[in-house]
């Protein structure tokens, strides 16, 4: 059940994108906000169960990359720190989604905005729950792409596109930092 914390925002993003192309903005709002609030509620439950009651939870663990001696698993970390981050990310994101209903009421691209926002939440959750550096890198890149899309949302404004490119370039500095960490600490991504 706790795996839904991570995947509900992705489901919300995909459905928002699909529904937004076919229907009015109301179904898009309902789907994306429902997915986020459900993810937030499960985050609070996970926080209580794992951080307060100290119960263990094994998340998804799937073979991802096998190449010679290199092996990487796709797995999520559910410990106290991750649960605190789930709580913070999902609670803030749910409130931002709710606020966006009024803020974006004048815009014609509401569905696209909600899809980008839900994708940003998913990428952030992937980042904070990753159990190895390779998966963390994918979460980091997802956050970078989502930031670029959100900052440059009003792409017809020169200031928005300029700021989006600037954010994208700054994110490359983070990529360099992650690469330097990997080079200086050459450990196996998964045990």
Predicted features and spans:
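Functional transmembrane alpha-helices
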Residues: 9, 79, 116-119, 126-178
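Single conserved hydrophobic/aromatic residue that forms the stacking wall/gate
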Residues: 181-191
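Transmembrane helix-loop-helix hairpins at membrane boundaries of multipass inner-membrane proteins
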Residues: 1, 15, 19-115, 184
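Membrane-embedded, hydrophobic transmembrane alpha-helices
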Residues: 1-7, 11-12
């Amino acid at each position: 059940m706790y795996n839904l914390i991570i995947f509900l925002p992705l489901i919300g993003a995909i459905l928002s994108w699909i529904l937004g192309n076919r229907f009015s903005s109301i179904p898009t709002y309902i789907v994306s906000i429902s997915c986020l609030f459900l993810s937030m509620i499960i985050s609070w439950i996970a926080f209580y169960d794992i951080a307060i009651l100290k119960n263990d939870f094994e998340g998804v663990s799937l073979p991802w990359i096998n190449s010679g001696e290199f092996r990487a698993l796709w797995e999520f970390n559910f410990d106290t720190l991750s649960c605190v981050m789930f709580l913070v990310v999902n609670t803030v994101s749910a409130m931002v989604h709710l606020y966006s209903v009024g803020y974006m009421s004048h815009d014609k691209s509401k569905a696209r905005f909600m899809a980008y926002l839900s994708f940003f939440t998913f990428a952030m959750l992937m980042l904070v729950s990753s159990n190895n550096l390779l998966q963390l890198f994918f979460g980091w890149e997802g956050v970078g792409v989502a930031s670029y899309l959100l900052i440059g949302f009003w792409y017809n404004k020169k200031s928005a596109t300029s700021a989006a490119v600037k954010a994208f370039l700054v994110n490359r500095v983070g990529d360099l930092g992650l690469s330097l960490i990997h080079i200086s600490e050459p450990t196996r991504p998964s045990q």
